[in-house]
Amino acid sequence: MRALGGALALLGMVALSAPAIASDREFAACLQQLRSEAATKGVSSATFDQHTAALVPDMAVVGFLDAQPEFVTPIWDYMAGLVDAERVADGRAMLERWAEVLARVETQYGVDAGTVVAVWGVESNFGRNFGSRPLLTSLSTLSCFGRRQAFFRGEFFTTLKIIQEGHVAPERLTGSWAGAFGHTQFMPSTFMRLAVDFDGDGRRDLVDSVPDALASTANFLKRAGWRGDLDWGFEVVLPKRFDTAGAGRRNKQTMQQWASRGVKRVDGSALPAAATPAGLLLPAGAAGPAFLVTRNFDALYAYNAAESYALAIAHLADRLRGGAPLVTPWPTDDAGLSRAERREVQSLLLARGHDIGEPDGMIGARTREALKQVQGELGLVADGRAGQAVLKALRDAESR
């Protein structure tokens, strides 16, 4: 029986390793094909050989192409985590630290310091989180496997050109699984089009040069249509029985037209008497906060095509400039948590014996599974969501 068990185990190892062997062979063949195209993409054979010789595929990134989120984040959770007291304080410190650079950036590109720093804060938490996946590994894998190979081949060759031109050292090029990197998370192709050398050292470096990263971000927004004489928008109040059929950031009317329909700023004051086009944004429906948004909001949307993302950047920028929190509450009886509160939830889960790793404020799969169990034990809906209700229940249970 022992011999049979060993044989079965060996067969299992062979079966498990066969796909990996096949992947390695496919990858090697794919790299040879890519090498034959390199010169036409502006990449020398020497550069290609030097930086691909030791590459092995990371098949995990292929799975991300079609991965469906197991947990859809409500906007009140998204905003609570991205625009919290911690990020506002850190952002204001960065405004002070980089004031001279930001003033020059605004003069040259017409994008205010608060907006640039808000992008920085959301994209990498002010340089604390670039992403840990080596770009050449991820992009070469995605160039050879899965959907969108043509797109990722372009990003792969562009990454090699970035290295070849001496902008960023290859070992410093780590980022997201899809290839975004640096302080403000540019894709390689975006880097080539829009990154600038703002510190004057002859390199465009979004990893080790904060001035280059901030100026490149402003250049992106300017090219996306940002106007320095215009707000991104602001929170508004709608009159009762307001017809929201025409809501949407693309369905723009002038401020005068919105005013004629009874729309006011959230403090009750009248809208600007201007012909400025603006769309009505209702990110949580008619029961939640409402905003009039201008072309500058569209420029933020161009940075990352999600309205919740653009709103987080816009609101964080307002808070960095001394603005107040949103006035209208989100339509929920279980509001979202700041990162500090998320870490507290994780600490309380650890105290109850759940092995979820160090508290980091990131609500991942292990934290959600632990939350489901605890929610069931505490009489809450076991959905794995980290909100104020489960935080209160955990605090109460801890104090008993």
Question: Which residues does each predicted region cover?
Answer:
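Sec/Tat signal peptide C-region and signal peptidase I cleavage site
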Residues: 18-22
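Catalytic glycan-binding domains that act on GlcNAc-containing polysaccharides
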Residues: 43-275, 288-291, 300-317, 321-339, ...
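Bacterial N-terminal signal peptides
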Residues: 5-17
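Short acidic, glycine/serine/threonine-rich helix-capping segments at coil-helix boundaries
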Residues: 337-342, 350-394
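Low-complexity, glycine/alanine/valine/leucine- and proline-rich hydrophobic stretches
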Residues: 295-296
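N-terminal mature-domain "stem" immediately C-terminal to a signal peptide or N-terminal signal-anchor/transmembrane
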Residues: 23-57
